[in-house]
Regions:
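N-terminal cofactor/phosphate-binding cores enriched in small/glycine residues
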Residues: 39-96
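Fe-S ferredoxin-like electron-transfer domains
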Residues: 2-19, 74-233, 238-264, 279-282
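Catalytic alpha/large subunits of respiratory electron-transfer oxidoreductases
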Residues: 123, 191, 252-716, 749, ...
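Long, low-complexity segments enriched in small/aliphatic residues
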Residues: 607-608, 613, 762-857
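Glycine/threonine-rich phosphate-binding loop and adjacent beta-strand/alpha-helix elements that clamp
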Residues: 414, 715-736, 745-754
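Long, contiguous, secondary-structure-rich segments that constitute the structural scaffold
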Residues: 736, 740-790, 857-868, 872-980
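Short beta-alpha connecting loops at secondary-structure transitions
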Residues: 32-33, 96-102, 223, 472-480, ...
């Protein structure tokens, strides 16, 4: 326990100690004396950190333990017995036998003089303003006993008398261009922490120190505003600033928080830990949690700042019902809404049969909520017609890794990338979709000054940021044609096999011999060579050979992949091909290697783990397994159907045919996110009872008959599971605006359907999951609260915190299984009518269908979906930057503005899908993965031409949307509507 009087600097609100410099890992330790206290630390530890570990606070300004030591502020000086001078404790390593003093009359005088210089160029009221409780400069001034400043610089005199020694920073204008934070140069002491955070933590290098001496200042780019610079608004600079020169606008507007709660971000699959800092019942800011294993104190613009949607005026907080989708909504009580939904589902099953209804779970909801929805479908509906949005993103990951390795999850932790020598990124754009992990990856690619950076292979049709940015460049960019992934991965395997680059000992020990021999014979065929596939993929054979050799021989090689792998007609085949490559080179089962799917949403992994697929119970156990099924039957007190139920696309087809009549859609917007929008909308219009549980009237809810208000991540308790199988707590920081958390709504619906559920807290739900699921047997809230997080498998056979690396001694299935990957061309081929290939993706500032981020200031960066088109293709069509262009496929047509760019290759166009009015999925088709029905979002044959007006679909959508909003308005504001 630290002596409070000596405790290192920390913000009492956050209860996180800042040790001044980063932790060092070393087998060798050293022992020294600091102010008479003996302390033992790993070799390489700074004196500042050693002192902090001993409970001694060495004053400092430029140092923080999230950044490498810089040694510029001269406040952290110490005395070392037997040495001359006063070295900086942040840059001086601890040595055996050292005797160090951090306090002496001389050190006090030195620090006081330095602090007076800082304060002379700082607002005078900072010394006396109690509101600046978190300002480290004020704390350091107090420690140095600085109450007044002897130097009469302009900052203190309030005039231009400081001009003789440099610019008067106190007269510099604030930069308030960023919607989330301000930069006040008057408070800046040019400690460079913000600059170093932008470089070391984020890797954007958007900030710099301009000028020299007293004229030095922090500059965003070439003296640009933050908003107009390359700043990505991750918040690292704000977090690093010791003086409130960089500060959240929410703090300025609402005041400083008075309490905090640790929770988990509800955006992407990185699963960043945050502290929700509150004032009363109001969220003031979200601060990245230093001890969060997934993010280690870093954040992105979405998680750090874009949480305001939780209290947006569009939130629906009253249950609503209506008979037809053309009727006005009617606000009702919770009991009336639940009873109505239950009676409708019962009526449909009595009229059309037990299998006429089903449910869809959401990857935005907690494990506990998802578990309850699939349980409701199986136990209350009595069928297996349950599916999840993972169907349309990472279902091929589950199939492919399950077939080859034996379990449906990535093999590594995010931290593992720090030990990779070769990184291969396939069909993923981490800087936009997984930015916090991307920053960690970029640090490894840059190197640390001692160790060289890792080599990088990028496989992507577009020139994503990782291909060529100021500080990271790919060694190989394999810019393949969309839809040819399997041809490329098979060609790489051909090189590894035919050039003798296999890890023979690993294969002999760890893999199935027969499957390996069959695979080796298959890939060695001349038809699978890079030369044979060159015209198919569009990638020069020598590039494929070079990349394959690098992956096989470059040391620890790690593969990270995204939806550019899975969302194809051969998505499952490609996942298998990746697994083959990793096994063939021995790159599974230790740190720095592995096969790592970058999951798109916050709980995609968890929604699959919880049994959301129609053929699997929790823990990826098949519904047809009598032993497994009997365990759940005994626990749930029902007889379960042994046959798998309908997948999401099957539900739509059955609805269009008239046999599927009711849907419980929990937290998922299938109209905007699923392919072939017009088919999905038609299917919903044919159903007699669509129940949507969400926080906004999303596109799917406009086809609903019952609306059950959901809760945001700030209003719920539970857990999320991220892309590294890490289970983290989600903690309620405010009461549900609608009065009930999502799990409570599902419990009430199940009870009304006749299947009783008696949970009183999500912890009880997780206890049931742990009791029924071997891989979760050791998971508990108590353990997560104590350790911060755990990783499944977590049971008696693992460490207490679970399993960081899978398949260490053997694969989950026993022996790794090789499977042949025969390339089959996509049905989406270019023709005279449709000569271009469309692929889709995301952008940094927006998230998925945009329901959350569109209701935040993130729209300032990206307020519409645009179509990227290569200059050659644009010129051929007479298209210029910003022109409206029509995009037509065999499924439909929409209109977007054009962005003419060389990020895409000739023959390829690209767009995002964040805005419903864009209709990006109006033009994606019904083509899907052969094994899982995952849609082929990444390959659609299209034509692009200049147009002068919106498409027919967009006109119809605009009219339908206006009508639905009017019907909502009639329910929410009946008196005002009547008056009009």
């Amino acid at each position: 326990m630290l002596n409070p009087s000596l405790a290192p600097l920390h913000d009492p609100l956050r209860l996180e100690i800042d040790y001044g410099t980063p932790r060092r890992e070393a087998a060798e330790v050293v022992t020294l004396s600091i102010d008479g206290l003996a302390v033992t630390v790993p070799k390489g530890t700074s004196l500042m950190r050693a002192a902090a570990l001993a409970g001694v606070n060495v004053p400092r300004l430029c140092a923080t333990d999230s950044l490498e030591a810089f040694g510029s502020c001269r406040v952290c000086l110490v005395e070392i017995e037997g040495r001359k001078g006063y070295p900086a404790s942040c840059t001086t390593p601890a040595e055996n036998g050292m005797t160090v003093r951090t306090q002496s009359p001389k050190l006090k005088d030195l620090r006081r003089g330095v602090m007076e210089l800082y304060m002379s160029d700082h607002p005078a009221d900072c010394l006396h303003d109690g509101a600046h409780g978190a300002c480290e400069l004020k704390q350091m001034a107090d420690l140095a006993d600085v109450r007044e400043v002897r130097y009469n610089a302009g900052a203190q005199a309030g005039a231009n008398v400081g001009a003789a020694i440099g610019a008067n920073h106190c007269e510099a204008a604030k930069d308030e261009s960023n919607p989330y934070f301000t930069f006040d140069p008057a408070k800046c002491i040019v400690c460079s922490r913000c600059v170093r955070a932008c470089e070391e933590t984020q890797g954007t290098f958007a900030l710099t120190i301009a000028g020299r001496g007293f004229d030095s200042r922090v500059s965003a780019g070439q003296d640009q505003s933050f908003m107009n610079s390359e700043c990505v608004s991750c918040g690292a600079c704000v977090e690093a600033c010791p003086t409130d020169a960089l500060q959240e606008k929410s703090v300025i507007l609402l005041g400083r928080p008075d309490r905090s709660e640790i929770t988990t971000c509800a955006y992407c699959g990185v699963g960043c830990g945050f502290k929700a800092e509150m004032k009363g019942s109001e969220v003031i800011r979200m601060v990245p949690w230093k001890d969060g294993k997934a993010n280690e104190g870093h954040s992105c613009v979405k998680g750090r700042f874009a949480w305001g949607y939780a209290t947006h005026k569009d939130r629906i907080t009253q249950p609503m019902i209506r008979a037809k989708i053309t009727d006005p909504w009617r606000e009702v009580t919770w009991n009336e809404a639940i009873d109505h939904a239950a009676s409708e589902f019962k009526r449909l099953q009595k009229t059309y049969g037990r299998d006429s209804v089903g449910g869809i779970t959401s990857s935005r909801c907690t494990n506990e909520e998802t578990y309850l929805v699939q349980k409701l479908v199986r136990a209350a509906f009595g069928n297996n017609n349950v599916d999840t949005c993972a169907r349309v993103c990472h279902s091929p990951t589950g199939y492919g890794l399950g077939q080859t390795f034996g379990t449906s999850a990535g093999t590594q932790t995010f931290k593992s990338v720090e030990k990779a020598d070769v990184i291969m990124v396939i069909g993923a754009n981490p800087t936009d979709a997984h930015p916090v992990f991307a920053s960690r990856m970029k640090r490894r690619l840059r190197g640390d000054g001692v160790n060289a950076g890792a080599k990088l292979i990028v496989v992507d049709p577009r020139r994503i940021d990782l291909v060529d940015s100021p500080h990271v460049k790919a060694d190989y960019h394999l810019a393949l044609k969309p839809g040819t992934n399997v041809a490329l991965i098979t060609a790489m395997a051909h090189v590894i096999v035919t050039e003798g680059l296999l890890s023979s000992d690993y294969i002999a020990e760890r893999c199935d011999t027969k499957s390996f021999h069959d695979w080796r014979e298959f890939v060695a065929k001349p038809d699978n060579s890079p030369e044979a596939f060159e015209t198919v993929t569009g990638v020069p054979a020598d590039q494929v050979r070079g990349a394959a050799r690098l992956y096989a021989t470059g040391g620890n090689a790690a593969i990270y992949y995204g939806l550019g792998v899975t969302e194809h007609a051969q998505g499952s085949t490609m996942v298998i091909g990746i697994a083959n490559l990793a096994m063939a080179t021995g790159n599974v089962g230790r740190e720095g290697v592995g096969v790592n799917p970058l999951r798109g949403q916050n709980n995609v992994q968890g929604s699959c783990d919880m049994g959301s697929f129609p053929h699997e119970l929790p823990g990826y156990r098949h519904i047809s397994d009598t032993t497994v099924r009997s365990q759940f039957e005994a626990a749930w007190g029902v007889t379960l159907e042994a046959e798998p139920g309908l997948r999401i696309p099957n539900m739509f087809d059955a609805a269009a045919d008239g046999s599927f009549k009711g849907l419980y859609c929990h937290g998922e917007d299938i109209v905007q996110s699923d392919p072939d929008t017009q088919h999905v909308a038609h299917a919903l219009s044919q159903m007699e009872c669509v129940v949507v549980q969400d926080i906004f009237l999303n596109e799917t809810a406009k086809y609903a008959h019952v609306f059950l208000p959901g809760s945001s991540f700030l209003e719920r308790d539970g857990t999320f599971t991220n892309a590294e199988r890490r289970i983290s707590r989600v903690r309620k920081v405010m009461e549900p605006l609608a009065g009930l958390a999502d799990w409570e709504v599902t419990v009430k619906l199940s009870n009304a359907l006749g299947y009783p559920m008696h949970y009183t807290h999500p912890e009880e739900i997780m206890q049931e999951v742990a009791a029924l699921t071997p891989t979760f047997a050791g998971v508990s809230y108590e353990k997560i609260d104590r350790l911060g997080s755990v990783q499944w498998p977590c049971n008696e056979d693992t460490e207490e915190a679970g399993t960081s690396v899978l398949h260490v001694d053997h694969f989950v299935r026993g022996k790794g299984r090789f499977i042949n990957t025969q390339y089959v061309a996509s049905d989406e081929k270019v023709t005279r009518k449709f000569p271009l290939l469309l692929t889709t993706g995301r952008i940094l500032s927006q998230y998925n269908v945009g329901a959350q981020t569109r209701r935040t200031p993130n729209n300032l960066w990206h307020s519409e979906d645009r179509l990227e088109i290569h200059p050659h293709d644009a010129e051929d069509r007479g298209v210029h930057e910003g022109d409206w262009v029509g995009i037509e496929s065999r499924a439909g047509q929409t209109v977007l503005r054009a962005t003419v760019t060389e990020r895409v290759q000739p023959g390829v166009v690209y767009t995002t899908f964040h805005f419903p009015e864009s209709g990006a999925n109006v033009i994606t088709t019904d083509s899907s993965d052969w094994a899982t029905n995952c849609p082929e979002y990444k390959v659609t044959a299209v034509q692009v031409m200049p147009v002068a007006q919106p498409s027919t679909w967009q006109k119809d959508y605009a009219a339908f949307n206006r009508r639905q909003l009017d019907l909502l308005d009639q329910a929410q504001h009946p008196a005002e509507v009547m008056a009009k």
